Amino acid sequence: MGAEVTSQDTQSAQTAPDQAEAGSFALTFGPREAELVRHLYAESRAVLEYGSGGSTVLAVTLGKPVVSVESDKAWADRMSQTLAAHPIASVHYADIGPTKAWGFPDGAEAAGRYHTYPLTVWDRPGLVAPDLVLIDGRFRAACLVATMLRTTEPVTVLFDDYLKRSYYHRVEALATLERMVGRMAVFTVTPGQIPPDMLTETIGWFADPR
């Protein structure tokens, strides 16, 4: 989610993880994408992430409220421990059953819960409405749909690994692709409903963990 968070990114010692803690969670984007993330996180009011790690620590370092969705229970627990002293940050664990590398479902026995990954974070009591959403985890196309359905104002969406993965590109029928920065797409997503002629297709995205 690269370069490590540095002391130049620190806004407040009160909200920032200590140096050793931050250094263990580096941004893993390419240099151009990492610079974009740093800039937009600094400009944001509140951040919602699908996928946690270095970007989550960056948000805390900048003093931004952040909620990160995770499907890997062990990783979610580790991130929760890291963020425990920082009430502006939290991890939203979405139980999609057993997972393997990168939080992909390990088998389909819990497929009936897949929709909880994109959607249930929006039901959290007291959720600070995000104006920036990072999509860098599972069910990526569905996460954009969930954002469109649940946001009440236009939001900026950073969609990682978008460039060469053509199976994501149909989301352009739902949101405005503003620009590409390396492999990352920058969208403006406005509140809306799924067009009737796309309903079958988009519902399928909630079962696609890519």
Pin down the residues of each PLM region.
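Non-catalytic N-terminal targeting/anchoring module and adjacent flexible stem/linker
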Residues: 1-24, 199-210
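SAM cofactor-binding core of SAM-dependent methyltransferases
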Residues: 31-101
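Class I SAM-dependent methyltransferase Rossmann-like catalytic core
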Residues: 12-44
